Amino acid sequence: HAMNPVRLQIRSMLTLQPSPTGFRALLKVDPGFMLFPDHFPGRPVLPGICLVQAVLLAGEAWLVGTALRLGTLKSAKFLGIVQPGDEVVIEGIATHHDDGSVRIKADLSSRGKRIAQISLTAGQAVAITGAPA
């Protein structure tokens, strides 16, 4: 299935880094990010859902070969804003569960301060192949 343009751009800004436990990723926020003109005009701020998507993509990259889709957003605490050009460090853990779901918990920081804590459940994405019958 095709990835939406926002998810593709978030993925392009994300780099997985070595971590002794769990996963660590760096999100380098592109000043040209497609949602900035509307969120908010004159004072761009990265929408919180984009941080949720970055956590999902970082967990997906760490699990290698597992395409994930957001299931349930268990909790999201946003403690700061992310602006164009910021770098966000995402540190988290992803665990597989017997029901096939993946649980991801992550702390996000920027400029040395925690900016968000996100906990979510994801399911494996189903690839759509062929035309409908």
Regions found by a protein language model. Give the residues of each.
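Short, solvent-exposed secondary-structure boundary motifs
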Residues: H1-Q9, V82-D86
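Hydrophobic beta-strand-centered segment that forms part of the acyl-chain substrate-binding groove
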Residues: L56-A94, S101, G123
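Residues that act as N-cap/strand-start positions at coil-to-secondary-structure junctions
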Residues: L8-I10, L70, V88, R114
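Catalytic strand-loop segment that frames the active site of acyl-thioester-processing enzymes
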Residues: N4-L46
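Generic structural detector for well-ordered beta-strands
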Residues: L26-K28, K77, T121
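HotDog/MaoC-like acyl-thioester-processing domains
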Residues: R11-G22, P84, I93-A133
